[in-house]
Amino acid sequence: MPKKRSSPNRNVQIADQIQRDLSELLREVKDPRIGLVTIQSVELTPDYAHAKVYFTTLTGDPQQTLEALTHAAGHLHNQLFKRLHIHTVPTLHFHYDKTIERAVEMSRLIDEANANRAKED
């Protein structure tokens, strides 16, 4: 009998639910290294065994926040297990999301190029 595969839509739904639940759970974590953290996105492997969790932080050092989140990953996994109604709750792997920083840098470079072009004209 062929193995039943989950639909890509279900993968997205579960990733979104994990993102919402983690956002709530992080407010309850008492580690001072975790300041104002925003979960930007969650990417799941097809077998739901692993989840890449991308975050940004408004306060504090991103590296310290990453260490604190990695330290809290086991607790967060257990809390997700209580909330989610799926057979396998993924192992959480946190990654600092540099997308916003890159966008700001690109915007700065564009502004700089436009200013140089205006000076030349």
UniProtKB/Swiss-Prot annotation:
Q: Name one GO molecular function term.
A: ribosomal small subunit binding
Name the domain of life: Bacteria
One GO process term, biological-process aspect: maturation of SSU-rRNA
Q: Which UniProt keywords are listed?
A: Cytoplasm, Ribosome biogenesis
Cystine pairs annotated here are none
Which Gene3D superfamilies does the record cross-reference, listed alphabetically? Answer: 3.30.300.20
Please give the SUPFAM superfamilies that the UniProt record associates with this protein: Ribosome-binding factor A, RbfA (SSF89919)
* A Gene Ontology cellular-component term: cytosol
Report the locations given in the UniProt record. Cytoplasm
A Pfam family in this protein? RBFA
Return the InterPro entries for the record: KH_dom-like_a/b, RbfA, RbfA_dom_sf
Coiled-coil region: none
What's the main place this protein lives? cytoplasm
Subunit structure, briefly? Answer: Monomer. Binds 30S ribosomal subunits, but not 50S ribosomal subunits or 70S ribosomes.
Functionally, this protein is described as follows: One of several proteins that assist in the late maturation steps of the functional core of the 30S ribosomal subunit. Associates with free 30S ribosomal subunits (but not with 30S subunits that are part of 70S ribosomes or polysomes). Required for efficient processing of 16S rRNA. May interact with the 5'-terminal helix region of 16S rRNA.
What protein family does this chain belong to?
A: Belongs to the RbfA family.
Task: Tell me the protein's name.
Answer: Ribosome-binding factor A
Organism, scientific name? Paraburkholderia xenovorans (strain LB400)
High-level lineage? Bacteria, Pseudomonadati, Pseudomonadota, Betaproteobacteria, Burkholderiales
